[in-house]
Amino acid sequence: VVEQNENIVRNRKMLNQTSREMWEASSKAFARLDNKVPYIISTGNHEYGYKRSENGMTHFPEYFPFERNTAWRDLCVSAIPNRNGVASLENAAFEFNEPTWGKILIITSEFAPRDEVLDWAKKLVASETYKDSKVIFMTHGYLNPGTPPKGGTIRDKEKYALSPMNVGTQIWEKLLYPSSNIRLLICGHTGNGNSKYEDNVGYRIDNNTSGKPIHQMMFNVQF
């Protein structure tokens, strides 16, 4: 969990399977934040399919609908339907005005986002409304543990049947690199499970097409 003032950004898998019991437990855990904090969730591989992204089926919009948390009401500025054509916060954008940072746009995406998700995000950040905002993009799978040159590589494949999908290198090429105002990417997903901090976090910096640095950070709190 990353905490900035009164906003909480969460990027880790909520479940380790998609059973009703898991969804109920996750929903109950977040309930203490409802109507108080505008938490933002990035869905992971275990939120889809029967256990691990065999398909795009998910209960996310059922348990986390927009009207669940009144703290989202004035902050959510855009969203598009999920893989099943259902209105959902899986792909959504939230705008904040911070005294120190100015205008911030946080975009969260489904696991292994489809082309239409990346196209939506790219057009949104380049729009007249948000072209001067500092943008944070969240997605579940993107970066491997470590830092360059030995680690911190951008993921170029995912071993899931989910389709269509874009992996880390494609997210970089299609969205991050050509966008001039995305300044930070946050992801989760990877880790070695050995309880060593350095093996369960990742970080790298690369410049976008405008020559501006994009900080890319992975952390996996389950390990």
Task: Show where each model-derived region lies.
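Extended active-site neighborhood of metal-dependent phosphoesterases/phosphodiesterases
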Residues: I8-W120, T129-Y130, Y197-M218
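Short, active-site-adjacent cap segments at secondary-structure transitions
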Residues: V2-Q4, Y48-G49, N144-P145, G193
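Acidic/histidine-rich helix-loop elements
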Residues: V2-R20, F66, G146-P164
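Active-site beta-strand/loop signature of hydrolases that rely on acidic residues for catalysis
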Residues: V1-N7, K13, G44, K134-H140
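Active-site proximal loops enriched in glycine and acidic residues that flank catalytic Cys/His/Asp
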Residues: H140-G141, M218-N220
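His/acidic metal-ligating clusters that form di-metal
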Residues: R32-N35, V86-E90, E95, K103-R204
